[in-house]
Design a protein with these regions (language model features):
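A contiguous, well-ordered beta/alpha segment that forms the leading edge of an enzyme domain
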Residues: 4-5, 13-158, 171-181
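Hydrophobic/aromatic-rich core segments of domains that either
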Residues: 23, 179, 187-198
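Short, conserved phosphate/pyrophosphate- and ester-handling motifs at nucleotide-, phospho-/glycolipid
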Residues: 162
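Short active-site segment of divalent metal-dependent hydrolases/proteases
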Residues: 165
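Penicillin-binding protein/beta-lactamase superfamily catalytic region
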Residues: 168
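Short beta-strand segments
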Residues: 184
Length: 198
């Protein structure tokens, strides 16, 4: 009987220690690196990566099958819930900044060569000609459809994608009851609870 008590105490102690384990996950995503530290008895490395991949499937211009890439090519006006979240946050920040933040700048970004390589800088005339395609007033969300009010409008969500990736991982942790975590993707950070003291 005494041995059984010792075994049970030992198991409780081991399980208690496992709950205090801080886990670390890191790698490359969205053209940058990520670092995630969280306290959990479960290893969520695969799930963390899956949450980040949701952003690539929806908002990456480098994934030709992403929602935003198909929308830009005019193949579909239908968008997914993550795209809608991005659009609504982008519109909100656009209004707060008086238009300084604008995800419809993709034609200008591409002309300057940041997205798709371009050897020479665009002329003032080229820039002026592209401005007709820039502005949140050029698109309208209608349920699960994002309608182009001006043909030629494109979006570049790279300025908001890393933050959305961080939010998705944090929401996953919250659903799983993880109380202590730090998520960083390319400088975008979200923390909750206590830090790892080691």
């Amino acid at each position: 009987m005494k041995k059984l008590g010792i075994i049970i105490c030992g198991l409780v102690l081991v399980m208690g220690c496992q709950r205090n384990v801080y886990r670390f996950s890191e790698g490359s995503v969205y053209g940058t690196v990520y670092h995630v530290s969280y306290q959990s008895e479960m290893d969520y490395a695969v799930e963390i990566r899956q949450e980040m991949e949701r952003v690539n499937q929806s908002l990456s211009m480098f994934n030709k099958e992403s929602v935003i890439a198909r929308w830009t090519r005019g193949e579909s006006e239908r968008v997914d819930s993550l795209f809608v979240t991005m659009y609504e946050k982008a519109r909100e920040v656009n209004e707060v900044t008086g238009g300084a933040f604008d995800v419809t700048v993709a034609p200008l970004v591409n002309a300057w060569g940041f997205g798709f390589k371009n050897e020479k800088l665009p002329s003032d005339e080229k820039i002026d000609s592209l401005l007709q395609y820039v502005g949140m007033d050029k698109v309208q969300l209608e349920g699960e459809r994002l309608v182009k009010l001006v043909e030629g409008v494109q979006m570049d969500a790279s300025s908001i994608a890393k933050g959305l990736g961080v939010d998705l991982v944090a929401e996953f942790f919250d659903r799983k009851g993880v109380q202590n975590y730090m998520i960083e993707i390319g400088g975008e950070i979200r923390v909750k609870g206590e830090r790892n003291k080691k």
